[in-house]
Curated annotation (Swiss-Prot):
InterPro entries: DNA_recomb/repair_RecN, P-loop_NTPase, Rad50/SbcC_AAA, RecF/RecN/SMC_N. GO terms for cellular component: bacterial nucleoid. Belongs to the RecN family. Keywords: ATP-binding, DNA damage, DNA repair, Nucleotide-binding. One of its GO terms (molecular function) is ATP binding. It comes from Xylella fastidiosa (strain 9a5c). The gene is recN. This is DNA repair protein RecN. NCBIfam families: PRK10869.1, recN.
């Protein structure tokens, strides 16, 4: 709900600050006083394009600001949270238009684009009467209103989910197809696999091959080492280890009886001779196993060379070649299965399309019923509002393609015939601001109780009417004001008398320059203003009495 509006150096306004409450607020005043400037200011705060002509003569810039109260779950609050502009429970819009033509905008004291300002304003205020900023002229907004009237949230959610699922499957298929023909890639990898599969790439086998290569490469040195070690341990000369151990054992045996501790030494020497014998036996076995085989060594080196060449090619170690081979085999298998996967995706896409059509059909049925009901109710109201023979038709038009659309199978177009015999035309093509305001009023009254924009502004709604029709227009605006905040600029006393709150705009000459001023009227001032609207500049007793009667009738409603 709009709580506060500040207008500075805007057109003929120097500085005004207005407070607004719930219900219906009317704005009246003499012709040319600037009644519509409030609505113009709200339009610019809603993102309308502006030029320097709106800046008061002699001022450097015009400054506009508005403050709205919004609940935590209000769509405007959700929008603010999504763009990280939320601030407590209030929403502040600010716009500066410079005399040089420049313009800047803020939401909650943070700079924003006019597009962002406009997006937020669609959740805050609906201005009826000027084509350039009337959300109801948008076909998307018409569809939103129709769906709200139909109360088909469940059906809409089902359609949106079905469309999203279909789109996700389509994206997956497109991604697969974007990879192109896999035959070349398969042939290339299969050639590499054949190369790898020629070799035994088992890591244990490669480890054993390396060990065998080391032995073959050092066989001569191993044989020589075995011979020398055997000679050292048990040679023919008296300096071999085994001969010396025997000599030492013999020397001790002659004196052991004199010191029992020497028996332990004898035991250790016996063990040493046993271990030397075992070492000699193992050396003999190893020596016999060692054979110099140049052909076998060459074969081993060739195979190791091939393994290292493959490892360099695939940028891994020889021990990792088996894992590389398995990865490539898996990739080939995956690519071979792509056609199968694409066929499965096509089947799932077809099923998703069927589910969307089923959901969209249910949504279309609810919309068709709601369109008929809303059209009938609105048509009756249009005729009540002085547009005899007028008719509203709500047309559901199929989308041009058969792709699942998240909004369903059709678009909406509100068509209006304002006079008998005239063909219905799109609502957005109505030339008369007064007719457009009354049609909008009829639609809004027909849709009472729906969760629509909280603040509704009507300009020119009473253009070209009077008498009983004016009274009906006032009643409908008053009824709308019971559930929404309504701001109405009017020149008709029957409409002005229906407001909960009344502002008067007047022209005041200051230093030879005409300026607009606005004031909130109390009950006495209000009666005087309505009497002026009834009788002109010179207020008669009859006009004063008639004004009092209009206000009294409101209290008795």
């Amino acid at each position: 709900m709009l709580r506060h509006l500040t207008i500075k150096d805007f057109a003929v306004v120097r500085n005004i600050e207005l407070e607004f409450g719930p219900g219906m607020t009317v704005v009246s005043g003499e012709t040319g006083a600037g009644k519509s400037l409030i609505i113009d200011a709200l339009g610019f705060l809603s993102g309308l394009r502006a030029d320097s002509s709106v800046v008061r003569h002699g001022a450097e810039r015009a400054e506009l600001s508005a403050e709205f109260n919004i609940t935590i779950h209000h769509p405007a609050r959700v929008w603010l949270r999504n763009v990280e502009l939320d601030d407590a429970d209030q929403c502040q819009l600010r716009r500066i238009i410079r005399a040089d033509g420049g313009s800047r905008a803020w939401i909650n004291a943070r700079p924003v684009t006019l597009s962002q300002l406009s997006d937020l304003a669609t959740h805050l205020v609906e201005i009826h009467g000027q084509h350039e900023h009337q959300t109801l002229l948008s076909r998307q907004s018409q569809l939103v209103l129709l769906d709200a009237y139909a109360q088909n949230e469940t059906e809409r959610d089902a359609v949106q989910q079905a469309a999203a699922h279909w789109q996700a499957l389509l994206d997956e298929r497109d991604a697969l197809q974007a990879q192109g023909d896999m035959s070349e890639r398969i042939n290339f990898i299969e050639h590499q696999l054949t190369e790898l599969q020629r070799e035994n790439l088992d890591p244990a086998t490669i480890t054993a091959l390396d060990a065998s290569h080391r032995r073959q490469a050092h066989t001569a040195a191993l044989i020589e080492a075995c011979k020398n070690t055997t000679q050292t341990l048990n040679g023919d000369d008296t300096t071999s280890a085994l001969h010396l151990l025997h000599a030492a054992r013999h020397t001790l045996s002659r004196v052991t009886e004199h010191d029992a501790r020497l028996g332990e030494v004898e035991t250790l020497l016996d063990n040493a001779m046993i271990q030397v014998d075992e070492a000699l036996t193992l050396l003999d076995r190893i020596h016999n196993d060692l054979n110099i085989d140049p052909e076998q060594l060459e074969a081993i080196e060739l195979r190791i060379g091939r393994l290292h060449s493959l490892a360099r090619k695939y940028r891994c170690t020889p021990l990792d070649l088996a894992a590389q081979r398995d990865r490539m085999a898996a990739e080939v298998e995956s690519m071979r299965n792509m056609d199968i996967h694409l066929q499965q995706l096509d089947h799932r896409i077809s099923n998703a399309m069927t589910k969307w059509r089923q959901a969209a059909e249910k949504l279309s049925i609810s919309r068709t019923r709601a369109a008929a009901a809303l059209s009938t109710t609105t048509t009756n109201l249009i005729n009540e509002l002085g547009m005899g023979g007028g008719q509203l038709l709500i047309q559901l038009q199929p989308h041009e393609n058969n792709r699942p659309h998240p909004n369903g199978a059709e678009r909406t177009e509100f068509l209006i015939a304002t006079n008998p015999g005239q063909p219905p035309r799109p609502l957005r093509k109505i030339a008369s601001g007064g007719e457009l305001s009354r049609v909008s009023l009829a639609i809004m009254v027909a849709a009472l109780g729906l969760d629509t924009v909280p603040t509704m502004v009507f300009d020119e709604v009473d253009t070209g009417i009077g008498g009983a029709i004016a009274d009906i227009v006032g009643q409908k605006l008053r009824a709308l004001g019971e559930q929404h905040q309504v701001l109405c600029v009017t020149h008709l006393p029957q409409v002005a008398a229906k407001g909960h709150t009344h502002y008067r705009v007047s022209k005041i000459p200051i230093d030879g320059i005409t300026q607009s001023a606005i004031c909130l009227l109390d009950s006495q001032e209000r009666q005087e203003e309505i009497a002026r609207m009834l009788g002109g500049v010179h207020i008669s007793k009859e006009a004063h009495a008639a004004a009092g009667k209009l206000l009294q009738e409101l209290q008795e409603m």
